[in-house]
């Protein structure tokens, strides 16, 4: 099993990065792992911590319509270059917490995605260099108020509500380029989304390079790589689970705000 890097909070409120062991004990690191954090002698057992989102980025850069089938279901052409937008860090929540349905919207959709974790400051770089700046991978749900997205024209409000970026549950360093991403609702065994991540229009190295030519990415920043076809509405009480082979599962429940 690949090493799983987590971010946790102990009962006293202290926040740590750590390595999740098969026993679910966490070996605490002395710094974020992408900043060369090293293992310490401190071990926390499952009853003594709660898992947080695996990083605390300065920004979340997301990519729209990066799977051709999703662009088609949205009734739009595939972009000729990456379509990027921002989500605020305050939208992040960990796995096993609640997505809050905002009263301003009548249509909130799930969007299961692969997330990249940036490990080093990167600015104006080539795809080859960009690949070396991707420290690891996790799972995201780019929750979207679809009606507000259409109403507003630009996406800040639709994508930016608190709780609209479930992220986690941990980070892995390596990922099979053909890993499958699937999204499930409630107890249905049939996925509502299913695609291999190598079906992206613009792969991760190209995305990071493109973004770096616009804005500097910092260690711990997050890049959301787009969602495949199959997006649809969430209802109050729904449980939405995004799975990526080689990483794990990200699960959240929809609740009233």
Question: Which residues fall in each region the model found?
Answer:
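A structural-propensity feature for long, helix-poor, extended segments
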Residues: 95-115
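Structural signature of FAD isoalloxazine-binding scaffolds in flavoprotein oxidoreductases
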Residues: 78-95, 110, 241-245
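N-terminal accessory regions of nucleic-acid-interacting proteins
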Residues: 123-137
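Catalytic-pocket segment enriched in acidic/His residues
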Residues: 46, 50, 70, 101, ...
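N-terminal non-catalytic cap/leader segment that marks the start of a structured domain
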Residues: 1-82, 174, 182-184, 188-191, ...
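Residue-level recognition of short, solvent-exposed, well-ordered loop/turn junctions
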Residues: 62, 109-111, 218, 235-236
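A glycine-rich (often HGG/GG-containing) alpha/beta subdomain
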Residues: 27-29, 34, 86-99
């Amino acid at each position: 099993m690949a090493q799983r890097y987590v971010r946790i909070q102990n009962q006293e409120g202290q926040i740590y990065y750590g390595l999740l062991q098969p026993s679910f004990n966490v070996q605490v690191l002395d710094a974020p792992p992408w900043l060369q954090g090293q293992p310490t002698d401190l071990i926390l057992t499952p009853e003594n911590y709660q898992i947080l989102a695996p990083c605390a980025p300065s920004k979340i850069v997301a990519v729209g319509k990066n799977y051709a089938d999703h662009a088609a279901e949205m009734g739009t052409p595939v972009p000729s270059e990456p379509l990027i937008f921002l989500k605020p860090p305050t939208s992040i929540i960990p796995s096993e917490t609640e997505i809050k349905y905002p009263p301003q919207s009548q249509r909130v959709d799930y969007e299961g995605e692969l997330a990249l974790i940036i490990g080093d400051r990167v600015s104006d770089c080539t795809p080859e260099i960009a690949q070396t700046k991707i420290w690891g991978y996790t799972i995201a749900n780019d929750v979207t108020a679809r009606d507000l997205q259409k109403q507003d024209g630009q996406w800040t409000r639709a994508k930016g509500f608190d709780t609209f970026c479930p992220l986690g549950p941990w980070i892995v360093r390596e990922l099979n380029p053909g890993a499958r991403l699937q999204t499930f609702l409630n107890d249905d065994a049939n996925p509502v989304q299913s695609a291999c991540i190598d079906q992206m229009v613009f792969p991760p190295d190209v995305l990071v390079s493109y973004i770096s030519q616009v804005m500097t990415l910092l260690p711990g920043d997050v890049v959301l790589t787009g969602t495949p076809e199959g997006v649809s509405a969430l209802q109050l009480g729904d449980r939405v689970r995004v799975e990526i082979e080689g990483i794990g599962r990200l699960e959240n429940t929809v609740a009233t705000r």
